[in-house]
Amino acid sequence: MATPGPVIPEVPFEPSKPPVIEGLSPTVYRNPESFKEKFVRKTRENPVVPIGCLATAAALTYGLYSFHRGNSQRSQLMMRTRIAAQGFTVAAILLGLAVTAMKSRP
């Protein structure tokens, strides 16, 4: 059995340069977005998600208000509505991801 010798890399490593990985081209963001800019961009790309989030928050708020006032039937209805709004929001997110994935394909 032959023992392997020392491994000599094909390209010498230079600490001053970033590592080279085949098939990877890192991108450097030259103009980072602020929170507001990113929120507006994402809302324009998929406007249904914020609507679903607002519907979920509204149903939760009104349901808690009804519970506090002692109206248990209305409170239960709002909690069920909240679950439906959450499902709608998750479906909108998944649909948005699918559309984005289809757009990025050549």
UniProtKB/Swiss-Prot annotation:
Where are the membrane-spanning stretches?
47-67, 83-103
Q: Give the sites modified to N-acetylalanine.
A: A2
Which Pfam family is an annotated match for this chain, by its short name? HIG_1_N
Q: Which UniProt keywords apply?
A: Acetylation, Electron transport, Membrane, Mitochondrion, Mitochondrion inner membrane, Respiratory chain, Transmembrane, Transmembrane helix, Transport
| Main localization (coarse) | mitochondrion
| Gene Ontology CC terms | mitochondrial inner membrane; mitochondrion
Query: Mind listing the GO biological process terms from this record?
Result: mitochondrial respirasome assembly; negative regulation of apoptotic process
In terms of superkingdom, the source organism counts as Eukaryota
**Mitochondrial matrix membrane side:** 104-106
Give the membrane topology, semicolon-separated if more than one. Multi-pass membrane protein
Question: What are the residue boundaries of the HIG1 domain, all occurrences included?
Answer: 20-106
Annotated compartments: Mitochondrion membrane; Mitochondrion inner membrane
According to its UniProt entry, the function of this protein is described as: Proposed subunit of cytochrome c oxidase (COX, complex IV), which is the terminal component of the mitochondrial respiratory chain that catalyzes the reduction of oxygen to water. May be involved in cytochrome c oxidase activity. May play a role in the assembly of respiratory supercomplexes.
- Summarize subunit and interaction data from the UniProt record for this chain: Associates with cytochrome c oxidase (COX, complex IV); proposed complex component.
Tell me the PANTHER family matching this sequence: HIG1 DOMAIN FAMILY MEMBER 2A, MITOCHONDRIAL, HYPOXIA-INDUCBILE GENE 1 HIG1 -RELATED
Tell me the protein's name: HIG1 domain family member 2A, mitochondrial
